[in-house]
């Protein structure tokens, strides 16, 4: 069998290349084997990645056993929770592009034959997906697995419990000592945080796309089945290599439709919209944001995981995981069940072996949480290119909300205003100049949204922003407002006291001023200019596109 890597290891002209490969431990026999790239993301400062140094060893062992040469390399990672609420969050979304670029660079520079991606958290998963689609060599994903939920006084807790606990301390609901107990209990093991936050949402959707084996998104990091899954994934990769099945053969428009469908049915993180749009672009597919509303209108919400309920990823795994959700959705004909996956099975074959919905963690289609989906795209004069809301996390009485604007031009200003008591019932908190260009980096607004919940305002206050949200955000929070303020978007002309209408059932978001006043303000609007000290972030701000296009870089 001829390999792509023969370009660097075959023929007399490649003697210097082989000399260097010998220095890396390769032998004569290895020059007849495929070079299998392993993109690891081990790092000491992300709980979802601290175990990946050990986790990769049986994967490399399996590659050798099956006749390949494992070539491990690492990519960077940012822990969004640790980067949250300060200038560090400017680097989170941009890190996705660096990860994709790193994979392209290593795989193509060394002409690797196939790729194993080992991500787990937030931007690492989509960054690797983008990179894998870009290089388009046979690829399988093996995520590090989710964290076990914590427990305090018989109640499950997670990272969002800690964020919301800050507001509870401020309003006197709990003491600082009680918060410390929650803090010490919320993250008890390695793994991606235990709710349906961005990391776990993306790991689950990697299954749906067809690039990972069943169980990839839900089997816990500390579960022995995770290693079995990993070894089986390596076996699947060698089948893909033999048949020359590549990521773009698997990630089709139908696969993206199914990913959005499952995402919407399980109330995944709103960040998934941004990432799936970027993934579509790397797959050569122009995906229309408005299409997501069509999917949402026909897709029931049948699963709610923290922060939308008391259930956690371990509960979803217990009842059958993502295949069980897909099995239930297939009863309505919502999925393309003939699609092939890296497992060698079709989606239909995978779900035929899945348990039926238990009726609690995964509800039946006859008894959904709601008849439409857990994510919606809003349009209107405030968001001509669209905005995203995670409806699964919105109090039903807040689905339609009219309130008076209170405006902040940064996340820091907003947090100070919320915790300082400036935000009152009936307000719509407007946080702007936090978009991809304006931030730069489109920071997550988890600290402000958690402060609102912790201050007891979750059913009395809405929040809109051109930034984005953590998967842990809940409440009437509308993000990704496009165009952003820094690009001249209408969110920049909102004034304190203006009335804003958020109408989720009708997918509308409107600034309630006259058309004449609106046009006059837009005519006179000059976006604020920020000084960006970082040369990397300056380049990012210059090249990044709108959130409505996935916030990808375009030269």
From Swiss-Prot:
Chain positions recorded as Mg(2+) binding sites: 80, 122-123, 444
Keyword field: 2Fe-2S, Amino-acid biosynthesis, Branched-chain amino acid biosynthesis, Iron, Iron-sulfur, Lyase, Magnesium, Metal-binding
Keyword rRNA processing: no
Database matches in Gene3D superfamilies: IlvD/EDD C-terminal domain-like
Cofactor comment: Binds 1 [2Fe-2S] cluster per subunit. This cluster acts as a Lewis acid cofactor.
Residues at the catalytic site: 470
N6-carboxylysine carried by residues: 123
GO cellular component, one term: cytosol
Pfam families recorded: ILV_EDD_C, ILVD_EDD_N
Keyword Magnesium part of the UniProt annotation: yes
Residues that hold [2Fe-2S] cluster according to the record: 121, 193
Catalytic activity: (2R)-2,3-dihydroxy-3-methylbutanoate = 3-methyl-2-oxobutanoate + H2O; (2R,3R)-2,3-dihydroxy-3-methylpentanoate = (S)-3-methyl-2-oxopentanoate + H2O
Pathway given in the UniProt record: Amino-acid biosynthesis; L-isoleucine biosynthesis; L-isoleucine from 2-oxobutanoate: step 3/4; Amino-acid biosynthesis; L-valine biosynthesis; L-valine from pyruvate: step 3/4
Recorded GO MF terms: 2 iron, 2 sulfur cluster binding; dihydroxy-acid dehydratase activity; hydro-lyase activity; magnesium ion binding
E.C. code: 4.2.1.9
InterPro entries: Dihydro-acid_dehy_C, DihydroxyA_deHydtase, DiOHA_6PGluconate_deHydtase_CS, ILV_EDD_C, ILV_EDD_N, IlvD/EDD_N
One GO BP annotation of this record: isoleucine biosynthetic process
Cofactor(s) required, per the database record: [2Fe-2S] cluster; Mg(2+)
Listed NCBIfam families: ilvD (TIGR00110), PRK00911.1 (NF002068)
Function (record text): Functions in the biosynthesis of branched-chain amino acids. Catalyzes the dehydration of (2R,3R)-2,3-dihydroxy-3-methylpentanoate (2,3-dihydroxy-3-methylvalerate) into 2-oxo-3-methylpentanoate (2-oxo-3-methylvalerate) and of (2R)-2,3-dihydroxy-3-methylbutanoate (2,3-dihydroxyisovalerate) into 2-oxo-3-methylbutanoate (2-oxoisovalerate), the penultimate precursor to L-isoleucine and L-valine, respectively.
Family the entry assigns: Belongs to the IlvD/Edd family.
Protein name as annotated: Dihydroxy-acid dehydratase
Species, as recorded: Aquifex aeolicus (strain VF5)
């Amino acid at each position: 069998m001829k390999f792509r890597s023969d370009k660097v290891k075959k023929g007399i002209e490649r003697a210097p290349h082989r000399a260097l490969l010998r220095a890396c431990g390769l032998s004569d026999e290895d020059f007849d084997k495929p070079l299998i790239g392993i993109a690891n993301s081990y790092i000491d400062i992300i709980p979802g990645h601290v175990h990946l140094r050990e986790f990769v060893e049986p994967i490399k062992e399996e590659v050798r056993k099956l006749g390949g040469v494992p070539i491990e390399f690492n990519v960077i990672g940012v822990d969004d929770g640790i980067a949250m609420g300060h200038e560090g969050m400017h680097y989170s979304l941009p890190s996705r592009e660096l990860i994709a670029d790193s994979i392209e660079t290593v795989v193509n520079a060394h002409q690797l034959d196939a790729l194993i991606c080992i991500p787990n958290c937030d931007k690492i998963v989509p960054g690797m997906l983008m990179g894998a689609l870009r290089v388009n060599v046979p690829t399988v994903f093996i995520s590090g697995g989710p964290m076990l939920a914590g427990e305090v006084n018989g109640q499950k807790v997670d990272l969002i419990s800690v964020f919301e606990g800050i507001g509870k301390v401020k309003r006197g609901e709990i003491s600082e000592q009680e918060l410390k107990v929650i803090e010490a209990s919320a993250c008890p093991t390695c793994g991606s945080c235990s709710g349906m936050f961005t990391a776990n949402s993306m790991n689950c959707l990697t299954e749906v796309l067809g690039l990972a084996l069943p169980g990839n998104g839900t089997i816990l990091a500390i579960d022995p089945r995770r290693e079995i899954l990993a070894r089986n994934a390596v076996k699947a990769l060698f089948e893909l290599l033999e048949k020359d099945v590549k990521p773009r053969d698997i990630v089709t428009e139908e696969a993206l439709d199914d990913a959005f469908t499952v995402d919407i049915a399980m109330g995944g993180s709103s960040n998934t919209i941004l990432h799936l749009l970027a993934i579509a672009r790397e797959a050569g597919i122009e995906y229309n944001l408005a299409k997501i509303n069509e999917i949402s209108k026909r897709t029931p919400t049948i699963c709610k995981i923290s922060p939308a309920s008391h259930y956690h990823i371990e509960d979803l795994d217990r009842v059958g995981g993502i295949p069980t959700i897909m099995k239930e959705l297939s009863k309505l004909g919502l999925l393309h069940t003939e699609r092939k996956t890296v497992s060698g099975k079709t989606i239909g074959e995978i779900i035929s072996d899945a348990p039926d919905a238990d009726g609690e963690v995964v509800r039946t289609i006859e008894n959904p949480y709601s008849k439409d989906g857990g994510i919606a795209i809003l349009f209107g004069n405030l968001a001509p290119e669209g905005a995203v809301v995670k409806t699964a996390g919105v109090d039903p009485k807040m689905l339609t909300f009219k309130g008076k604007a209170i405006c902040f031009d940064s996340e820091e200003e907003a947090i100070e205003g919320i915790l300082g008591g400036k935000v009152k019932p009936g307000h719509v908190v407007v946080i702007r100049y936090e978009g991809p260009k304006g931030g730069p980096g489109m920071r997550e607004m988890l600290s402000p949204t958690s402060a609102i919940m912790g201050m007891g305002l979750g059913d009395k206050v809405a929040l809109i922003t051109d930034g984005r949200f953590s998967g842990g955000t809940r409440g009437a929070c509308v993000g990704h407002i496009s165009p952003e303020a820094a690009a001249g978007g209408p969110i920049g002309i909102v004034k304190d006291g203006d009335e804003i209408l958020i109408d989720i059932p009708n997918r509308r978001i409107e600034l309630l001023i006259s058309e004449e006043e609106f046009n006059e303000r837009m005519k006179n609007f000059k976006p604020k200019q920020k000084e960006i000290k970082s040369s990397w972030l300056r380049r990012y701000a210059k090249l990044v596109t709108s959130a409505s296009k996935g916030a990808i870089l375009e030269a």
